[in-house]
Amino acid sequence: MNIAILLPYKENFSKNYAGAVSIFVNDTNKLSKFKRSIKVFGSTENKNILKNYINIGLKKNILLSTTNQYLNNFAKLIKNKKFDILEIHNRPHYIPFLCKISKTKKILYFHNDPLKMQGSISIKDRETLLNITDKIIFNSNWSKSRFLIN
């Protein structure tokens, strides 16, 4: 089973400067029976990166937002590769774009308050996520309860 994990674009996946999401991803990947077929995608300038990492290059572009550039470059990287699962961490607003470019199953992880994240603030946003995401995983009961608030 081939799994692509997309980190938030500001998340460092490095030994010395890893953020909370990177630490979680790295620790859970070490325990996975699929660890040899997991690729982690992100954007970092740090050179001391962790295993199975593919850097998404970003260039300053006043005509394209960093998020759009990040997602477009990710799409190019996975275009000709076969992944069974796309795992997205803490970025619900990435999901609609990823649905347009890939039929691969999508799993969304929430590490923080969903009501403060673009793409899951409104009830309509959250209903859409429930309909277009194959699975949503919450790192705590608190974040799950926040997602389910009316």
What residue spans do the PLM features occupy?
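Alpha-helix capping/helix-boundary segments
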Residues: 46, 92-94, 142-144
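An amphipathic, basic-hydrophobic alpha-helix
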Residues: 61-85, 95, 120-121
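Extreme N-terminal starter segment of soluble prokaryotic enzymes
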Residues: 1-3
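Short His-centered aromatic/hydrophobic patch
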Residues: 88-94, 110
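A short, active-site helix/loop in glycosyltransferases that binds the activated sugar's phosphate group
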Residues: 119, 126-127, 132-150
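Short, well-ordered alpha-helix to beta-strand connector turns
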Residues: 35, 83, 103, 132-134
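Hydrophobic faces of well-ordered beta-strands that scaffold small-molecule active sites
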Residues: 106-108
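N-terminal strand-loop element at the rim of the active site
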Residues: 7-16, 23-66
